[in-house]
A protein has these predicted regions:
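Pepsin/retropepsin-fold aspartyl endopeptidases
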Residues: 1-161
Length: 161
């Protein structure tokens, strides 16, 4: 089932992802910018700080350099972009899927945010109608939970390694 959200006037969609901040009993949400595809998504250092993550912990993640750093719709490169692993994540109701159910596990898990987090979806941005349509890729529904890394990967990606 495809989901549709409106693009803003600058040409990218803002989607909301729910996460549980470190040492917090409640869920919070973070915004992602989606441009012409999954490669243009990031969560900013500032937003992570607002959600209560320690600055040193954020900077312990992999800092994206050069071509690895995402760009926004204007073509400008995003500064201070870190690839970090968050304690828990749940995709919000804009998608309608629950990662715990998809992995057939009820335990909390970590999920790599950034470009990898959007690889499970097909993206279609219609700039004339100002909408972004996206849906979960059918073959990606079978996800593998890596207990050692505490992360999830699509089975197809794991089998290639």
């Amino acid at each position: 089932m495809a989901h549709k959200i409106n693009l803003n006037p600058l040409g990218f969609a803002i989607i909301r992802v729910y996460i549980r901040p470190k040492n917090s009993p409640t869920m919070a949400y973070a915004y992602f910018k989606v441009d012409t595809g999954a490669n243009c998504t990031t969560i900013s250092n500032k937003r992570l700080s607002e959600l209560g993550y320690d600055k040193n912990w954020i900077m312990s993640g992999k800092r994206l350099e050069g071509n690895e750093r995402p760009t926004v719709a204007s073509g400008l490169v995003v500064d201070d972009c870190y690839r970090v692993i968050l304690p828990e994540i749940q995709i919000g109701d804009w998608v309608g899927y629950n990662w715990s159910v998809l992995t057939s596990l009820s335990v909390p898990f970590k999920f790599l945010m950034g470009t990898d987090s959007m690889q499970f979806f097909n993206w279609n941005l219609d700039y004339e109608k100002n909408v972004c349509i996206f849906d979960l890729i059918p073959g990606k529904r079978k996800l593998l939970f890596d207990q050692k890394e505490q992360s999830i990967h699509s089975i197809e990606d794991t089998e290639q390694k």
